[in-house]
């Protein structure tokens, strides 16, 4: 089998498995199996692959045909121009979440302390620290396995993050100028209807936001006050249909300057608000 034939075979197998971008995935898996790049492929596309390369490529194709996410097979995902290690213990970083990072960067100044709640792979806090100077970063997650991934990503990207295993704010003692969070926000009954890559293979504890999808917003808005400085800012990623509900919850809890920010696709994606210490209401 030549490299060219391998691409065609892979594309056919993945199309039958209803993979949306079958050709691109076939190429990426071939590149991984054979340890080649585009330049090598175009020069050698009609050369025969070794039996070992064929076996490895077929094994990778089988995994993808089972709808295992490509990023879990390859073991990494790009986010904010940086590379992050990923596995089934963490959500795969998505471009939508870059909107949260970009909005946070607009309000973070040198000398500030930033907390990433529900950090997962660590992509949010690590991207913030890579794009700021003299900023202290901390991150929490309830999952020990997720924190292990996040710690590796911090090391690979050359930043220091104070990681803490915590059920939301349970073990958070410090005060922060900015708190960012991409919490679980999918309604429980929606998860089985998501594409298999998400519903079967991504960690449900990082997806499930309870019956209405809003459980973690309520808890974070209520509990963040002990750790968010007066006039500090809280920023959430939200589902595209949750902007009104989350912003109203923040306003009712006494946050000011609450507004919804859209992502590049024009969908509501981030809610941001300022902690007004004069107003203390329970959500």
Give the positions of each predicted feature.
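Non-catalytic accessory regions of SAM-dependent methyltransferases
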Residues: 1-36, 42
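Short alpha-helix
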Residues: 238-253
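Glycine-rich S-adenosyl-L-methionine
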Residues: 142-144, 196-229, 233, 239-242
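Conserved AdoMet
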Residues: 31-106
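Active-site beta-alpha loop architecture of Rossmann-like, nucleotide-cofactor-dependent enzymes
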Residues: 71, 186-189, 241
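Conserved SAM/SAH cofactor-binding pocket of Class I
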Residues: 95-193, 197, 219
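Conserved hydrophobic residues forming the short capping helix/wall of the S-adenosyl-L-methionine
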Residues: 14, 154, 224, 250
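Core SAM-dependent methyltransferase catalytic element
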Residues: 251-283
